[in-house]
Amino acid sequence: SNMLNQLFCDFLQEVIDQYGVIVKHGDYVEYCNVESVYYDNAETVLGNSIRNAVEKRFPWMIVRKAKKASIIDRIRCTVRLMGAGRFWITEDCKSLQTAFSDAVWNKDVKDKDERLDDGSTDIDSLDAFEYTIERDMRDLIEEVEDV
């Protein structure tokens, strides 16, 4: 757990170094756009451990359980953002690019749309991405409809 906490905090530092906008006064962080982390709520013990490690190193950051909104709602939101030209993936995010490219519907389910989750594609990267936007889906979709 300590090694995982260290790796996770190092990853957060890389994200902040690459994409962060920070306003600091000495050691005090007044503002940082990297402000929230969401974890799969099935991993409560791991989530609590990561929360404690993050709070020590990045005291302004909030660590929460993912809401785990309906998968189809998360997919539809992402598709709408893509269709409206409001979705971008950075070049250094190859795993997410591949996950989007490889994602397919489960052909064995006939009465509804269901993403295939049998280990043949990287659903974990899609879930992780979707957890970052799911709390803002309503606002993001409203903005798409206003375009």
Predicted stretch roles:
Residues 1-116, 139-140:
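Mg2+-dependent endonuclease catalytic cores in nucleic-acid-processing enzymes, primarily RNase H-like
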Residues 134-147:
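Acidic two-metal-ion nuclease catalytic site recognized across multiple nuclease folds
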Residues 35-38, 126-133:
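Phosphate/NTP-binding elements of NTP-utilizing enzymes
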